[in-house]
Amino acid sequence: VEEIVKIKSSFNVIDTIPDVEPGKHILLIDHEDSFVHTLANYIRSCGATVKTLRHGFSESIFDDERPDLVVLSPGPGRPKDFKVPETVHACVKRNIPIFGVCLGLQGIVEAFGGELNVLDYPQHGKPSQLIVTDSNSVLFKGLPETFAVGRYHSLYANPEKLPSQLKVTAITEDEVIMGIEHQSLPIAAVQFHPESIMTLTGNIGLAIIKNVVAKYTQYDKIILNT
């Protein structure tokens, strides 16, 4: 359970981000995480409709729903426990944009051939200072160069084995990867929890979600031949 902290800030970046186009439909894949409903509410507050699906469904659901964006939720364990890499492949095949959170980032890394390592000290309910390393990042557009985020993980993306298709967009002070984006596809992810109370200052967490939702839902829905 997070400690609820009242945070005051004169900086509110959310006011600088364009609104999400009306009628956008997002699928949120639930990997058995207690934050999933909070994450869904953050996405809804951006103006999009959200349908939450528990993992384990048929791949054909993407053809039926034709979402504008798929969000991969956090969750316990490893990405393979929930077939997250397979979900990533299914979305890529259909040209569906993806946003991953925590386990979602790890699954994206593995889907493209990367590897995960285990932290020496698990970060569960721990705040860290994030450093934005890519000024052109979709996720962190208009945000400060550094800010506090809430972390809940023991696995992390091995930077030495990061696939060439992915670029690092943010790190911690000890250089743990906190943000990635695909070099050419509409795929992005964060290792921290944007919906955490610890990522609240100036509505930073909501701004990150609104950035990716506003940008990635602009893509046309194209179902590619398998």
Where on the chain are the PLM-derived regions?
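N-terminal beta1-alpha1 cap of cysteine-dependent amidohydrolase-like domains
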Residues: 1-86, 90-96, 200-226
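Short alpha-helical
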Residues: 34, 57, 125, 157, ...
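Conserved beta-strand segments of alpha/beta enzyme cores
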Residues: 49-51, 115, 148, 167, ...
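Short gly/ser/thr-rich secondary-structure transition/capping motifs
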Residues: 50-56, 131-132, 170-173
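Cysteine-nucleophile active-site neighborhood
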Residues: 64-142, 146-148, 211
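Histidine-centered divalent metal-coordination motifs
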Residues: 102, 153, 193
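Catalytic beta-strand/loop cores that center a nucleophilic Ser/Cys/Thr
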Residues: 136-185
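C-terminal and late-domain segments of enzyme folds
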Residues: 167-171, 175-226
